[in-house]
A protein has these predicted regions:
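Pocket-flanking alpha-helical
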Residues: 77-116, 217-222
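Serine endopeptidase catalytic core focused on the charge-relay Asp
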Residues: 130
Length: 282
């Protein structure tokens, strides 16, 4: 499959003068910061990547100083090797570090319960919407239109991104025959759905994709994109699929200052309001 990408804005990298970015080669979006100087290592469910820079700045103010933070925004199964002490490769770059904080959905956190402290819920999302091409050229009005033969659907991979796939499918399976169409005909992401699936729609390989509301909000936010990339459709069954985001410390990190401070800050109203400002439910 050819390389697909969107004009993703940088966060921590934009403050550095010298770049070797090359789309399709030396371009990395889901690993943030400097792992060599980091004081705090965090792995997190990737679909919250847009809010983290704001949360970090607020955290530094709360802490009373800046800290070097390295964080990973991937589907939880993709960063699990790091939690279990295994290396993770991005092309020829090999990373092996010990996360101190894990942020993920309840289902995933329950699978690593022997490795982390008791997870705490710090925010919820607003459920699922339908992402469509700008102008909605196929005239999609809601989930019922997805059963139309000519409509191509993109969705996260049911094997590698189990949690998001289950959530998206649950929002759509009330339409007779749609579950079967998705299982047989959908275009599935291969590695990271929060990067791949929007690109499928943007490039016209798919007409529609179920995605979390805060993604749709992000793509229309002029702070990140001067021109909105997509349109989106809300529907009741999607709004009902709100998901929780939890945070836990890796065992052995309970007495370390920064991991404890980060977890405590995520549970504050200030952090919650920042998530809400990016399209989360709070």
């Amino acid at each position: 499959m050819r390389c697909l990408t969107l004009p993703w804005p940088l966060d921590l990298g934009k403050a550095v003068k010298d770049h070797v970015d090359l789309p399709g080669s030396n371009l990395v979006y889901d690993f943030h910061g400097d792992p060599l100087s980091a004081e705090l290592f965090i792995v997190m469910e990737g679909n919250q990547f847009m809010v983290i820079p704001d949360v970090l700045e607020a955290f530094f103010r709360h802490l009373g100083r800046r800290a070097e933070v390295f964080y990973v925004t991937l589907p939880p199964p993709r960063f699990r090797p790091l939690i279990e002490g295994h290396p993770l490769a991005i092309g020829n770059l090999v990373l092996k570090f010990r996360p101190q904080v894990v942020m993920g959905p309840p289902d995933f956190m329950s699978k690593i319960k022997d490795l982390v402290t008791e997870p705490k819920t710090f925010v919820r999302n607003k459920g699922v919407v339908l992402l469509v091409q700008k102008g909605n050229p196929k005239g999609i009005k809601g989930p019922e239109d997805l059963i139309r033969e000519e409509i191509k659907i993109a969705i996260s991979n049911p094997k590698t991104e189990v949690n998001s796939f289950k959530t998206y499918l649950a929002a759509l399976e009330h339409v007779p025959g749609l579950k079967e169409k998705i299982e047989k005909e959908a275009i599935f992401s291969q590695v990271i759905h929060h990067r791949e699936v929007p690109a499928f729609v943007f490039e016209g390989l798919a007409d529609v994709a179920p995605l979390y509301f805060h993604f749709a909000y992000y793509y229309q936010n002029p702070r990140f994109f001067e021109t909105p990339l997509f349109d989106y459709l809300e529907f009741p069954e999607g709004a009902a699929q709100q998901g929780e985001y939890q945070v836990a410390l890796m065992k052995g990190a309970e007495e370390e200052e920064l991991p404890r401070a980060w977890q405590a800050f995520l549970l504050t109203n200030e952090a919650r309001e920042l998530y809400i400002s990016h399209g989360f439910a709070g």
